[in-house]
Each structure stands twice: as C-alpha cells, then as structure tokens.
C-alpha cells in the first residue's frame, strides 16, 4: 500500500488495514521508513492489535532519509485485518519515525 504518509509516530500507536488478501501466503514484507533519532520497531499483527505477530521490522536511525526495510513473515495467508503496531526501542516515546508505504511479497518457491 503506497502513500500512507504516517508521520510523528508515537509508541503504542497503530494503523489498521482491513481485509488484506495474502492469498496462499506472503513470505516477506517491505516498508519504507525514516527516522532522525533512535527509530523503533513495527510489529505486523493479524486481526487485532495484540493478535498473531506475523513479523517485526526494526527501524534504525536513517538520518531522516527514507529506506526500504524488509522482514520475513510467518503464518501469513488468507484474508486478514493487518495492524502495524509501532513500538519504541529506547527512552524516546514520541516522534519515533515516519512510515510511508508497505508491500507484502509472495513466496517465490515454485513460481516462475
């Protein structure tokens, strides 16, 4: 999903994307993020903000330049509501990072 444009993310906030169809399975996810100080973490959770954690993306200090970050996904198939839950990894709790877009990637095993 392009152009989310979520800025000034605080610890514990989340974004809900309803009805994402992962088909027979997604193996990884890309996310475009930027941070100026400590960054943080994005938890990819299914169906509720504290549901199954399908993956986790660490967002480092990118010197405020957007970077594409990738992580593996587990047990991520079918249709789900997806929660991107934002967490602090330092004493900083406000304005952790910016989140521009995300894209799930299907497994390439057996595909041509």
Outline where the language-model segments fall.
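Extracytoplasmic
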Residues: 1-112
């Amino acid at each position: 999903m392009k152009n989310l444009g979520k800025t000034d993310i605080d610890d514990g906030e989340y974004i809900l994307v309803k009805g994402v169809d992962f088909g027979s399975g997604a193996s990884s996810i890309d996310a475009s993020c930027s941070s100026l100080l400590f960054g943080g973490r994005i938890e990819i959770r299914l169906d509720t903000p504290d549901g199954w954690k399908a993956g986790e993306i660490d967002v480092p200090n990118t010197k405020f330049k957007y970077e594409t970050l990738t992580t593996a996904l587990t047990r991520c198939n079918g249709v789900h509501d997806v929660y991107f839950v934002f967490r602090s990894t330092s004493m900083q709790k406000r304005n952790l990072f910016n989140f521009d877009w995300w894209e799930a990637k299907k497994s390439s095993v057996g595909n041509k």
